[in-house]
Design a protein with these regions (language model features):
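Active-site recognition of the HExxH zinc-binding catalytic motif
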Residues: 108-121, 137
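Hydrophobic (often cysteine-bearing) scaffold residues that line and stabilize catalytic clefts
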Residues: 21, 107, 133
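Short pre-active-site segment immediately N-terminal to the catalytic Zn-binding motif
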Residues: 85-110, 123-129
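Short conserved catalytic/interaction loops centered on acidic-Pro-aromatic/His motifs
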Residues: 121-134, 152-156
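Long, well-structured alpha-helical subdomains associated
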Residues: 2, 6, 10, 19, ...
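An active-site-proximal "capping" alpha-helix that borders the catalytic cofactor pocket
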Residues: 132-147
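Charged, glycine/proline-rich intrinsically disordered loops and linkers
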Residues: 76-94, 167-176
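A metal-dependent hydrolase signature that marks the N-terminal structural subdomain at the beginning
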Residues: 1-79, 92-99
Length: 178
């Protein structure tokens, strides 16, 4: 699985941090069918998103870039139709806990970018039309997040499972204390 995939980490220029790393991405890839990431050649972690871009696919549609983000932030505005902060372990209107940020980066951003590597129309005359665009990439991420989180995954890092009832209960208690 994915031994051929190259990982690089760029220098951070500010207080932004990489919330996930190579091992996190490898765990996600290990849970997916090989065919879904056969085009993937590299995953880069860089600081070029300026906290506005979470990730992107390079022009050749073979590399994914995950961008550094501030240590604490709220991502409510980044969510699209059908997604809630609670589905990642965060509370609406508040800064997201580190675990929720990591879940979002792996099971939303990374899967979304992997969705862009999927061929949508093999007969298309251009790369722009050949590969999945935003709607299909979002659907890909949503479908695979639901599949992967539908059953508990035995791993010591809770980022690889949906938020537990205990985790969500603590969020509710924190909201009441604020």
């Amino acid at each position: 699985m994915g031994a051929r995939i190259k990982f690089t980490v760029g220098r951070l220029r500010t207080d932004r941090v990489h919330h996930v790393g190579e091992e996190d991405v490898r765990v996600v890839l290990s849970r997916l069918p090989d065919a879904l990431y056969q085009r993937l050649r590299a995953v880069h972690f860089n600081d070029r998103g300026r906290a506005r871009t979470f990730g992107y696919v390079t022009r050749g549609r073979r590399e994914i870039v995950l961008c550094a983000l501030p240590p604490r932030m709220g991502l409510g505005r980044a969510l699209v139709h059908g997604e809630t902060p609670e589905s990642f372990g965060a509370k609406r209107g508040a800064k997201w806990p580190r675990l929720a940020l990591r879940r979002f980066m792996l099971y939303d951003v990374f899967l979304h970018e992997l969705g862009h590597l999927q061929i949508a129309d093999a007969m298309a005359s251009s790369d722009r039309l050949r590969f999945a665009r935003e709607k299909l990439a979002h659907e890909f991420a949503t479908e695979w997040r639901h599949r992967l989180w539908s059953e508990r995954f035995d791993h010591e890092d809770p980022v690889h499972n949906r938020p537990s009832a205990d985790e969500l209960e603590k969020l509710g208690a924190m909201a009441g204390a604020v």
